[in-house]
Curated annotation (Swiss-Prot):
CDD domains: HTH_XRE, S24_LexA-like. Residues 21-40 bind DNA. It comes from Salmonella phage P22 (Bacteriophage P22). SUPFAM superfamilies: lambda repressor-like DNA-binding domains, LexA/Signal peptidase. The record marks 1 as: Not N-formylated. In the mature form of the repressor protein the initiator methionine is deformylated. This is Repressor protein C2. Keywords: DNA-binding, Repressor, Transcription, Transcription regulation. Residues 10-64 form the HTH cro/C1-type domain. This protein allows the phage to reside inactively in the chromosome of its host bacterium. This lysogenic state is maintained by binding of regulatory protein C2 to the OR and OL operators, preventing transcription of proteins necessary for lytic development.
């Protein structure tokens, strides 16, 4: 049973994220006095204030209300709060990621992009090329977008991944499909064929973010 008060959870999350009371108040749309009262459990946030507070503290409303530890990994990121900046590299560099000790020299890279997603320090951006991941309906990641690749995330069925096929110099971007013990790289565009992989492919990383970077 969690005996911690709601105010203590609010204060602990704020401290962990290194946010001042005044800054948190601006993010939520209340005064720093209100934040102080919440943290001392004199009053409690509810309704829209609770939702805004959970987003600012990157946790679920249930965690703040009840201390549900299973919800602490559910993050609510604000679009205006970057979690980090990562380099935009070439598809050739991405294809060499598995072999190189240092696949790219960060200090030599000019283009960096922010993300609101938590990811490993070795993550990198790639610019989407071609229309193989442009779908007629549903999820579609067309040319002109950039994708953030995290090499530390486990590639699971249904995840979008960047992989390197044997004999190819550049990496490729596809959806990983596992079916009856077989693995495939599936384009989101049905006009392109699926590629079965069976030891002839290395998964470089999992796509954890995507955004439009270049307007036509």
């Amino acid at each position: 049973m969690n005996t911690q008060l709601m105010g203590e959870r609010i204060r602990a999350r704020r401290k962990k994220l290194k946010i001042r009371q005044a800054a948190l108040g601006k993010m939520v749309g209340v005064s720093n006095v209100a934040i102080s009262q919440w943290e001392r459990s004199e009053t409690e946030p509810n309704g829209e204030n609770l939702l805004a507070l959970s987003k600012a503290l990157q946790c679920s409303p249930d965690y703040l209300l009840k201390g549900d530890l299973s919800q602490t990994n559910v993050a609510y990121h604000s679009r205006h709060e970057p979690r980090g900046s990562y380099p935009l590299i070439s598809w050739v560099s991405a294809g060499q990621w598995m072999e190189a000790v240092e696949p790219y020299h960060k200090r030599a890279i000019e283009n960096w992009h922010d993300t609101t997603v938590d990811c490993s320090e070795d993550s990198f951006w790639l610019d989407v090329q071609g229309d193989s991941m442009t779908a007629p309906a549903g999820l579609s990641i067309p040319e002109g977008m950039i994708i953030l690749v995290d090499p530390e995330v486990e590639p699971r069925n249904g995840k979008l991944v960047v992989a390197k096929l044997e004999g190819e110099n550049e990496a490729t971007f596809k959806k990983l499909v596992m079916d009856a013990g077989r693995k495939f790289l599936k384009p989101l565009n049905p006009q392109y064929p699926m590629i079965e992989i069976n030891g002839n492919c290395k998964i470089i990383g999992v796509v954890v973010d995507a955004k439009l970077a270049n307007l036509p």
